[in-house]
Amino acid sequence: MLNDGVHFVEWSDAGDLIKGDISNNTTKAEILISKSALIWEDKQIVVAGFEFNANEQKVLLWSAPKAIYRRSFEAFYFLYDLNTKKLEALDADHSPQTLAEYSPDGKKVSFIHGNDIFIKDLASGKVSKITEDGKRNKIINGTTDWVYEEE
């Protein structure tokens, strides 16, 4: 359900992200992201999930999720701008990522890579590394260890 409470989004059989209208139960209204727009490095992205930012102008997409523990996963994250119709990697230098999530105002995205926390400013595109001490099975910043997922 979108913020207006009237529209919803879903994947069409053709692989497009489409916006439908609940009031007349139709999904023919508008293609938000066409399947042909989801090409990265000459390969079709198979989207496993997506999330809109607060003003619903950007879509965070993830592909090729790989399980870490019971509930956690790492994936390749992308941002799609609905105004410019531009697709970009969340951060190609630090990929795959875990737990990518919008800030409450939708202007930044935080994510985990290599047990360190990063933040991407969506306006400037600048990625900032927040922690420097992440180490596999030793120091885990921003996420849980396997034992927490078992409890």
Give, region by region, the residue ranges found by the protein language model.
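Beta-propeller folds
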Residues: M1-E151
